[in-house]
């Protein structure tokens, strides 16, 4: 664990000077997990397995032993060293929604979360800061899984829609899977098929390439809440609201066996990934069970929860470490090879099933948690997922917060065990490990940090409108954005876009307004409808109109409003009828070349276009019909940009220049 300074020296606020005359703001330090040193230390001192695994220096409760920390792969036989007992960071969106699914990307660099609003959110896996957000579904996302080849991502929502995604979040395909909400899905070992569980009481096996249904598994009497495909065998497991756990043969669609171990709705079924010999299930009866697939019976009964268990997950390295999340926000960790008797000692330890004379008839061994985090979240934990390296656990909850957990560093155990997540806010405040005012302040600081991360988030990959031939200003017609007065030339300046130079019209000069004191220059052409005036002569002002004291239009509008008069709707709007073809609305000047109106000389801006009428002849339009809406609200909804370009930008600022 290292720390990243929160000062932003480049922008002038945070660590350096002030910004716009304001004093610098100190953001403190953001915790960052740097596991590179631990992995390098393990790689340098590791030994082949046949000679015995490297145990390394024993970690002692002192900060000086932090350098001896090793990744979980270095100590496969010591799962207690990988128990995530320390809170790292809490990540929350600006617009908060319940987090239904959390999934680490296959390489472990980012965490992907899916919310009830149908949005994907990417969090950095090292600094836990916000990276990007996108609208993935129209309804709540209920399931999310990566393929075993790491080439595809499949998501399912509350409307029964299944979507295919590439790793860069390019939506390739969208199919209708079920008519009811889809609760879970899983890939086959070779990624050619995947299975879904739905509230319509069925499971469906889909062909991934064709997107068609190969098989429908029926047999549950109520909603199917969970499913999983064995990582190396042709075996599917499902859990339902009818309290049953069923095992299926995906080749024939036949139900192999039914496990009657729970007394309430099954919430999660998951195969163990390391050896593949066990199956874990959780239910709303406050228990979780571990089944041995070789004996087709339960071998362990996980107790300790005071409320329903909503989810569980296996450790990716240690096959005997299981974590569960409760509906009350508690997070428990179980070591399956240690019984960990009841805290009050009321239950005597029972030997394991494998140690009895008759394993087929022996009762399941009760196991109590090796570590408890009773106040991990304020509400139910919906999803848990381990980092591929096995050192960080991510949790998503109904309290709209995504939290990261890791093992305590040497010397941090007493402090981490007495925080508000372990003993509660009141007890932590009494012990001095948490301050209520400071907690609110930290929550505000975290929200401000997320806002800053959003400002530095990934930009939209949609290209801006390029300049059209003969049209400057990035593709915008002159005279549309900035009104111009005939007779006033436009200033030609180089354009910042790739389209080259263009005209940027200055604001109009009105006599008597601002710093304009002169009269407009003479017009180079006669005004239609005034044959008595020679060319170049400006007509006199209307009687009672003082050019030095122009009328206040806001005051006139207020007077009309008080008198009960409504201003006429603008021509071409929804409330005003369009005139017949060939007749202009009242108050509009005919376009150049119509009704005897002369064309403007070269270099002059054309007049504004008529509402509801087409553009000028030969005018170019945008390829997508002008429906280009750039989202500048602070949220960047786009796929990830190139990492090489980001690296070059950082190197140009002087960062990441040293070779590690």
Curated annotation (Swiss-Prot):
Output the SMART domains linked to this UniProt entry.
WD40
Q: One GO CC annotation, please?
A: mRNA cleavage and polyadenylation specificity factor complex
Principal subcellular localization: nucleus
Positions of the UniProt region annotated as Disordered: 1-32, 562-660
Its BP terms in the Gene Ontology are:
chromosome segregation; mRNA 3'-end processing
**What Gene3D superfamilies does UniProt report for this protein, alphabetically?**
YVTN repeat-like/Quinoprotein amine dehydrogenase
UniProt xrefs under InterPro entries: Pfs2-like, WD40/YVTN_repeat-like_dom_sf, WD40_repeat_dom_sf, WD40_rpt
Q: So what does this one do?
A: Required for 3'-end cleavage and polyadenylation of pre-mRNAs. Also involved in chromosome segregation where it has a role in chromosome attachment to the mitotic spindle.
Question: What protein name does the entry list?
Answer: Polyadenylation factor subunit 2
């Amino acid at each position: 664990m290292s720390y990243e300074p929160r000062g932003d020296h480049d922008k002038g606020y945070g660590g350096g000077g002030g910004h716009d005359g304001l004093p610098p703001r100190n953001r403190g330090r953001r915790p960052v997990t740097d596991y590179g040193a631990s992995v390098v230390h393990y790689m340098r001192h590791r030994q082949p397995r046949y000679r015995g695994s490297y145990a390394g220096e024993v970690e002692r409760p002192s900060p000086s032993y932090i350098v001896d920390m090793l990744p979980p792969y270095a100590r496969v036989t010591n799962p207690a060293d990988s128990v995530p007992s320390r809170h790292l960071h809490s990540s929350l969106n600006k617009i908060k929604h319940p987090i239904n699914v959390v999934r680490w990307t296959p390489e472990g660099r980012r965490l992907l979360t899916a919310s009830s609003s149908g949005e994907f959110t990417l969090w950095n896996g090292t600094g836990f800061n916000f990276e990007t957000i996108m609208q993935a579904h129209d309804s709540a996302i209920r399931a999310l899984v990566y393929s075993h080849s790491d080439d595809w991502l499949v998501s399912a929502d509350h409307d029964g829609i299944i979507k295919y995604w590439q790793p860069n979040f390019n939506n390739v395909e969208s199919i209708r899977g079920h008519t009811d909400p889809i609760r879970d899905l899983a890939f086959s070992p070779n990624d050619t098929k995947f299975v879904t569980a739905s509230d319509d009481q069925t499971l469906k096996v889909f062909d991934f390439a064709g997107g068609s249904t190969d098989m429908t598994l029926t047999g549950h009497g109520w909603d199917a809440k969970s499913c999983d495909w064995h990582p190396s065998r042709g075996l599917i497991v499902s859990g339902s609201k009818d309290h049953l756990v069923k095992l299926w043969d995906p080749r024939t669609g036949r139900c192999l066996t039914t496990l009657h171990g729970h007394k309430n709705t099954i919430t999660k079924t998951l195969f163990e990934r390391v050896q593949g010999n066990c199956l874990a299930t959780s239910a709303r009866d406050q228990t979780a069970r571990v089944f041995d697939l070789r004996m087709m019976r339960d071998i362990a009964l996980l107790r300790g929860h005071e409320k329903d268990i909503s989810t569980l997950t296996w450790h990716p390295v240690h096959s005997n470490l299981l974590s569960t999340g409760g509906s009350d926000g508690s997070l428990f960790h179980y070591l399956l090879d240690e019984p960990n008797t009841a805290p009050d000692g009321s239950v005597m330890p029972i030997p394991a099933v494998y140690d009895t004379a008759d394993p087929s008839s022996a009762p399941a061994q009760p196991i109590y948690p090796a570590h408890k985090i009773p106040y991990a979240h304020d509400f139910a934990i919906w999803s848990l997922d381990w980092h591929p390296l096995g050192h960080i656990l991510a949790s998503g909850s109904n309290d709209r917060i995504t939290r990261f957990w890791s093992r305590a560093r040497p010397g941090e155990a007493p402090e981490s065990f007495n925080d508000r997540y372990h003993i509660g806010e009141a007890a932590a405040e009494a012990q001095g490990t948490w301050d209520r005012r400071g907690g609110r302040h930290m929550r505000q600081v975290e929200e401000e940090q997320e806002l800053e991360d959003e400002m530095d988030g990934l930009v939209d990959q949609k290209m801006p409108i390029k300049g059209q031939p003969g049209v400057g200003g990035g593709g915008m017609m002159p005279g549309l954005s900035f009104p111009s007065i005939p007779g006033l030339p436009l200033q030609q300046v180089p354009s910042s876009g790739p389209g080259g130079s263009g005209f940027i019209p200055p604001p109009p000069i009105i006599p008597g307004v601002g710093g304009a004191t002169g009269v407009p220059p003479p017009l180079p052409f006669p005004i239609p409808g005034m044959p008595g005036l020679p060319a170049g002569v400006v007509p006199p002002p209307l009687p009672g109109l003082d050019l030095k004291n122009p009328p206040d239009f806001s005051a006139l509008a207020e007077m009309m409003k008080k008198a009960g008069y409504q201003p006429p709707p603008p021509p071409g709007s929804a409330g005003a009828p369009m005139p017949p073809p060939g007749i202009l609305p009242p108050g509009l000047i005919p376009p150049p070349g119509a009704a005897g109106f002369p064309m403007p000389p070269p270099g002059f801006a054309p007049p504004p276009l008529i509402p509801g009428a087409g553009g000028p002849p030969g005018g170019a339009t945008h390829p997508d019909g002008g429906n280009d809406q750039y989202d500048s609200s602070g949220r960047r909804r786009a796929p990830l940009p190139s990492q090489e370009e980001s690296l070059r930008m950082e190197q140009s600022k002087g960062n990441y220049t040293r070779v590690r």
